Amino acid sequence: MMYHRLRKLGFIWNHKRVYRIYTAMRLNLRNKRKKRLPARVKAPLLRPIGPNVTWSLDFMHDTLASGKTIRTLNVIDDFNREALSICVDTSLPAHRVIMELDKLIEWRGKPEKIRSDNGPEFVAEAMRDWCERNTIEWEFIQPGKPTQNSLIERFNRTFRQDVLDSYMFESLSEARKYANAWVWMYNNVRPHSSLGHLAPTEFLLKYGKLSEFPTFQQDDNSESDWNSLVLGAAS
């Protein structure tokens, strides 16, 4: 088609020359078709009957003072809204997500199901293989329907208000320090209206089996760490 179009425009090059230039300009490469996702079925968002039934995952983005982009991988247990992890880094590909989930399972135990959106890290083949090896069901919400994962969305909003929008971080290590201190405060101190104004660990102690489901592990000075960070930033 290109050859005949050029001939009509008055160019008398032969078809071999046209093809040679065409391929040299890499115009002969096929367009990559967008990968179609399988149909997602809307699932009811129900409170699990206990810990480690359903975890919810999501990513967030922010920038350091230098302008460099950072990402966070947030993981919560839907039963008591407990923040199991906030992993902060500049890049969080599928293999890194798997590594973080393996760390969580090592101390928390394995969930029956994980819920997330259709991000490329979550739909990757490596993630499907990991789920099969660990016999974990992965529930994807429908594209463009973040309300179907509203528990982690609500958590993200709180984390952004309390930390990401409140402080400007100079380095990745500083962002991690604030995130870790905030997670401890969120799990052990901050009351949640959806939990009867109990903190997640208090709710787990009252309605779950705390001894069988350890919570976010950190030293005993975690609350004072968060308070000192907040007071230091305000001064």
Feature roles, as predicted:
Residues 54-84, 90-92:
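An active-site-proximal beta-strand-loop segment
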Residues 2, 18, 58, 75, ...:
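Mobile genetic element proteins and their domesticated derivatives, centered on retroelements
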Residues 47, 134, 158-235:
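C-terminal domain-tail junction helix/linker
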Residues 64, 68-69, 86-108, 120:
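Active-site beta-loop-alpha junctions of metal-dependent nucleic acid enzymes
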Residues 116-118, 124-129, 138-161, 171-180, ...:
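RNase H-like two-metal-ion nuclease catalytic core shared by retroviral integrases
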Residues 7, 23, 27, 132, ...:
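Residue-level detection of the helix-turn-helix DNA-binding "recognition helix"
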Residues 1-54, 145, 199-208:
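Basic, flexible linker segments flanking DNA-binding modules
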Residues 29, 137-138:
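Hydrophobic beta-strand scaffold residues
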